[in-house]
Design a protein with these regions (language model features):
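Alpha-helical elements of Rossmann-like donor-binding domains used by nucleotide-donor carbohydrate transfer enzymes
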Residues: 29-33, 69, 73, 112, ...
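Asp-based, Mg2+/Mn2+-dependent phosphohydrolase catalytic module
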Residues: 1-14, 111-232
Length: 232
């Protein structure tokens, strides 16, 4: 039997980028890449915004081939072929950034907290808008997971309901018994809440200190020791 300060939860799932590691660390390590490929990265940012917006406006419809659509949108932005856009994206970002993540460290105590949660009986999951394996073992967290999903492969980025429902299905746990942890109010928290999951928002320390239960999430925390204390 799981004993938790948050009643009714049986599984805890995490976003990765900005949630398990500070987003600024990736920015720091990719500055040279951004400068060298600024046109492509600006186009990619616009395309992801379009795809996120689509997921928000039509949260129950998946794209039949997400990657083809993404490549076509990129091709339009850059005036190149979809194949060229897709090849660059796959080689330089999806695969090419793997080595950058080797130099990035996770938030302190993140892995240790997840080990404790796993030991307490919780199912552990990951749901990310990028492939979890892009981060290798996700700093040793991936082997602890019962489920690790990439929303792109499911045809819809967050905050679409689809990836969150697929997460619940893969965990074999009803949405109301899942706590989802993320750093984006718009994508992580809104998407998880829309299917009935409980939500935890990793926030700026001052925000977390002054407002432990913000209106947009069930709990807010600024470090993983604090998060563990809220749950166990």
């Amino acid at each position: 039997m799981i004993v938790s300060k948050i009643s009714g939860i049986e599984a805890i799932a995490f976003d990765i980028d900005g949630t398990l590691y500070p987003a600024w660390k990736l920015i720091l390590h990719t500055i040279p890449f951004f400068i060298l490929h600024i046109r492509f990265m600006n186009a990619f940012r616009k395309v992801r915004h379009i795809l996120h917006r689509r997921s928000s406006s039509d949260p129950d419809t998946a794209l039949p081939d997400f990657f083809n659509v993404q490549n076509e949108l990129l091709a339009t932005q850059l005036n190149i072929s979809p194949q060229e856009a897709g090849n660059f994206l796959d080689k330089e970002i999806y695969k090419g950034w793997k080595k950058k993540f080797l130099r990035i460290r996770p938030y302190p105590f993140a892995k240790e907290a997840i080990i404790r949660l796993k030991g307490a009986g919780f199912k552990i999951g990951i749901l990310s808008d990028f492939p979890p394996e892009q981060k290798g073992s996700v700093w040793g967290i991936l082997p602890l997971c019962d489920v690790a999903l990439n929303s792109e492969a499911l045809g819809a980025l967050k905050p679409s309901r689809i990836p969150f429902l697929k997460l619940a299905e893969a965990l074999n746990t009803s949405c109301v018994r899942i706590l989802y942890v993320g750093n984006s109010k718009t994508y992580d928290i809104a998407g998880a809440a829309a299917v009935g999951m409980k939500t935890a928002y990793i926030a700026n320390p001052l925000v977390s200190f002054f407002r432990k239960k913000p209106p947009y999430a069930d709990i807010s925390f600024s470090n993983y020791r604090q998060f563990l204390n809220y749950v166990l």
